[in-house]
Amino acid sequence: MSMFLGLLFLFPLFFILFKNLLPPRKKLPPGPTGLPLIGNLHQLGRLLHSSLHKLSLEHGPVMLVRWGVVPMAVFSSNEAAKEVLKTHDLETCNRPKLVANGLFTHGYKDIGFTQYGEEWREMKKFVGLELFSPKKHKSFRYIREEEGDLLVKKISNYAQTQTLVDLRKSLFSYTASIIFREAFGQNFRECDYINMDKLEELVQETETNVCSLAFTDFFPRGLGWLVDRISGQHSRMNIAFSKLTTFFEDVIDELLKTKQLDDHSDLVTAMLDVINRPRKFGSLKITYDHLIAMMSDVVLAGVNAGTVTMIWTMTELTRHPRVMKKLQEEIRATLGPNKERITEEDLEKVEYLNLVIKESFRLHPPAPLLLPRETMSDIEIQGYHIPKNAHVKINTYAIGRDPKRWTNPEEFNPERFLNTSINYKGQHYELLPFGAGRRNCPGMTLGITILELGLLNILYYFDWSLPSGMTIKDIDMEEDGALNIAKKVPLQLVPTLP
């Protein structure tokens, strides 16, 4: 009996000792309670960035949600984003292998969705040299200015009769024309097989499918694979991406009729030249799959994102007449009256336009969650343990609305950027429209130039007003989209000559 009592007395001591010998339990970020198998999927709505923002207000700027059975770390403050994208950039610069991304990129042969490694580095170097280098950017300046002239000419026809302009269609055509001429060597006005409306539909369908989830992505692999086949999800993705591939094959066939491959006048001819004369670029052997994947990347990232930002900017300017008036007065006073043509030299002269664009990026980042990252090792962010192979989301939408960082964050006020060094090039983590670190957007310079030039043209040459009977309060601000979050209801305005 006494031995039993002694053991009973010693047991708590042994338990405490044993517990102290165990490694300490790592502190995971807080997050909403999930359900078995599906995790938190039932709490995530159609607009993922908005759903995650609402959850972060309850659970904090570092949050863990379950994407089915997959852990997803969500970061909603500039401090946390800096730790991820700067301090732990190398450990978080991988991309998760998602079914849609693999199909879209022909087996991860691009630079946007490909996993981090030697092939990605070599491909990024090649594309940087053949499309995004300062030399190439300068050589393509005439294309951008010509398309700016054409945009003004088209809108002038509407202005003469004061007819409504669907800015989405006008600005999509302007952006797509530049991208196709620079990257693919194709001028829409010389191509009978390219229909702008059908191209816009194709881009939208592709973007929707790139961001759609396969059950394989978040269910146990065998179960997810089976559900994808039974539900037809895998088949739907294949059909959508095959349409894009067929379109690019037509572009390539047309280009081969008219271009010399060895002049490397655009990305497609440069890649075809390397493919047709087998050799390696560094350690990378470029294939036809690389070409189609890169064309897909350029269209997805280059065409829609710029259009979306111009539309949101014009929407906010229309909703805020004070800002519109101040901006147009500055533009016209700086550039002078009766200017025949806007050039890229003019972009550096209009300081307030730069502030307006920053504010538009803050409130309406085109891709509010950026592209997903994946941790390659266990890391610690803001004192929380983030496990290896967790998906990583940077919610730039939430960061732009953080009241701890911004005064009156829901207010459109470009003056907030006066006398600050904050820019959108990836060094300031409160404003990240192009991301930061190793996986930032390589086409940032081109994207910004297209955006600034388009806005400068339509704001210098035209005054803009709402349709008769419509007021500022009637402007619908509902969002829509998958990767690039656009204005759901088209922005239609009446242009007039000043």
From Swiss-Prot:
Membrane topology: Single-pass membrane protein
Membrane-crossing segments per the record: 3-23
Subcellular localization: Membrane
Keywords, in A-Z order: Heme, Iron, Membrane, Metal-binding, Monooxygenase, Oxidoreductase, Transmembrane, Transmembrane helix
UniProt-listed PROSITE patterns: CYTOCHROME_P450
Entry-linked SUPFAM superfamilies: Cytochrome P450 (SSF48264)
Binding positions for heme per the UniProt entry: C441
Pfam families (alphabetical): p450
EC number: 1.14.-.-
Co-factor requirement: heme
Coiled coil: none
Top EC class, one word: oxidoreductase
Record GO terms (molecular function): heme binding; iron ion binding; monooxygenase activity; oxidoreductase activity, acting on paired donors, with incorporation or reduction of molecular oxygen
GO cellular component terms attached to this protein's record: endoplasmic reticulum; membrane
Family: Belongs to the cytochrome P450 family.
Protein name from the UniProt record: Cytochrome P450 71B31
